[in-house]
Amino acid sequence: YTRGDKKIGYLVYNHFTPGPNGYSDRTYDEEMKKIFAGFQAQGVNEFVLDLRYNGGGYENSANMLAGLLIPEASRKKVFAVFSDNKGQSYSNDFCVETKGTAGYLKLNSNRIYILTSQSTASSSEVVINSLNPFMDVILIGELTEGKNVGMEMQKNDKYEWMYWPITLRVTNAVNYDYSAGFKPDIEWNE
């Protein structure tokens, strides 16, 4: 979309999945890089990310999307901090391998608009939280769910069962806790 000197990019993203065949398939992540290369080629300088219907998914895909959006000066900063109930924690930096694509979206401002709803949760909230310390994140919509926890699959092949217990609490580079959800800057109900 073009409005005056603004070239506005819009992306709706409904689930953080790297590819159709699970974690090791990166088909969708690679397609996302191509989409962002297109935004870059079109000179997009404002961006709207629609996460209203995104309940989460894989953290690596969320990191990849946030890495495409983060300002250049913040590319090697902390994306998220994961802490377990034993007091152990580790962090992931923003990361994207561009491999021949135009790469990151270079906005003329350090601002992004993100559309939210009550269904915006988990990895979607991690994206919001990870960008907050490094750019002006303007939320439009409804209060998000507040799911700031992560899970790890536990599997028993002998009895053919698996479960996903909550094992991690997720914060950002400044240790922000969003368990009550993110309140929108501009409230808007669909």
Locations of regions flagged by a protein language model:
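Short strand-turn motif at the edge of the Rossmann-like AdoMet-binding core
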Residues: R52
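P-loop NTPase catalytic core of nucleic-acid-dependent motor ATPases
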Residues: L49
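C-terminal "post-core" interaction segments
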Residues: L11, H15-S24, K33-K34, G38-E46, ...
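Beta-strand-turn-beta hairpins that frame and shape the catalytic cleft
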Residues: Y1-Y10
